[in-house]
Design a protein with these regions (language model features):
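Signature of dsDNA virion morphogenesis modules
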Residues: 1-176
Length: 176
């Protein structure tokens, strides 16, 4: 699924805290990286992968759109700054359906629920619907998006929903 839709992120807007009226740039590139190491990997590598990986998006931030945000983002990518990793990027994606992954973030270890009645029964436990992200037994529960998937952009945020922290820029980028 990821291989089919990732390139559709290109040219979509980036904003502050998912506020569509605070556009600060656009996505310029898309690819994949290993989960945990962030090593760039090719599209062919992920097609049959059974372990987590990242969708890696490159963006241009317009300093002229919001100079204070651009400066905060520069500080957030600088490992020497006290503000390091305070700002992260969070996907904005529309989708027509989802299944549930229960018990683990790793799909190879999760129980996948596709039955509509079971999904409806567990829906209120999802964080997206006000739940705590756990089943009655305390198992973690996640949405596994399916159907038609529509990349909409990125929200730069201090509180990402996904297991991500910070953004990356080459050292020469955060020195300017």
């Amino acid at each position: 699924t990821a291989a089919r839709f990732t390139n559709n992120f290109i040219h979509k807007p980036t904003n502050i805290e998912h506020d569509k009226e605070k556009i600060v740039g656009h996505i310029a590139s898309a690819g994949f990286s290993e989960y945990g190491t962030n090593k760039i990997i090719g599209e062919e590598s992920i097609k049959n992968l059974k372990k987590p990986f990242n969708i890696a998006l490159g963006a241009v931030v317009y300093k002229s759109a919001n100079k204070a945000f651009a400066m905060a983002l520069q500080r957030s990518v600088d490992p020497e700054d006290s503000y390091h990793n305070k700002i992260s990027a969070s996907w904005e994606v529309g989708f027509t359906d989802y299944n549930l992954a229960v018990g683990s973030k790793k799909l190879s270890e999760a129980r996948i629920i596709t039955n509509e009645e079971e999904k409806e029964e567990l829906k209120g436990r999802l964080k997206a619907y006000g739940g705590n992200g756990k089943t009655e037994k305390g198992e973690s529960i996640y949405r596994l998006i399916t159907g038609n998937i529509y990349p909409l952009g990125i929200g730069f945020t201090v509180n990402p929903a996904a297991d991500v922290k910070g953004v990356f820029a080459p050292p020469e980028e955060y020195q300017t």
